[in-house]
Amino acid sequence: MTRGVQIAASILNADLGALREAVQAAEQAGVDRIHLDIMDGHFVPNLTFGIATVEALRGVTSLPFDAHLMIANPALWAPRYAAAGCQTVAIHVEVPERHQGTLDAIRTAGAQAGLAADPGTPARAFAAHVAHLDFALVMTVKSGFGGQSYQPDAAARIKEIRVLLGAERLIHVDGGIRSSTAADAVAQGGDVLVAGTALFGAAQMRAAVEGLRPKA
């Protein structure tokens, strides 16, 4: 079941000196969403952008913003990203804190709440939180760096998480998504495909977007 697979452009792989133009180019190429990788230099070693960048880009497009928070203190920051204009906010299940309150706070702030999990995290980590989730963000590469390859066990993980979440909750798949891996991610239950290098590294972004969509 594809139920209208969506393509999210990860601007981590765009020209960071021209993010407004990158968002506009992605919209013109036909993507459905903009994916924002928020890194704090603590939960992951890299450091990217914060709320001020989200607010600046919010005026560039009406496309939904998906915030992927790779940060050590999501309880403090997650509701603020929702308030800044993100339609979805995902926090990492690996962060050692109680997640249900943060997920509920994201919803109260007006966004959909999600849990993200790295490849080494078992699917059962989602089980205790399903009632508080709108979606799962399944990482098919290690969080913190763009341009990695889709991991061999990705299909099995997506399928297992789909069974845990049931049919009604969405699964976003992030990492190594390109024309050669997109169909596999969708076949196992992915609803939103997050792509960066495959889009911003393409000669023709519109063709790259269409290359990720399921074929009729």
Regions found by a protein language model. Give the residues of each.
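Conserved anion-binding
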Residues: 18, 60, 76-79, 84-170
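N-terminal amphipathic alpha-helix/helix-capping segment at the start of soluble metabolic enzymes
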Residues: 1-13, 20-21
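A structural motif
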Residues: 28-33, 86, 133, 190
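Conserved, mostly hydrophobic/aromatic
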Residues: 19, 26, 37, 81, ...
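Active-site beta-loop-alpha junctions enriched in small/polar residues
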Residues: 10-14, 39-41, 70-74, 94-96, ...
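C-terminal helical cap(s) of enzyme catalytic domains, especially alpha/beta-barrels
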Residues: 106, 186, 198-216
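Glycine-rich, proline-tolerant flexible connector loops at the mouths of alpha/beta enzymes
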Residues: 33-51, 141-149, 199
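Hydrophobic faces of well-ordered beta-strands that scaffold small-molecule active sites
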Residues: 5-10, 34-36, 57, 65-69, ...
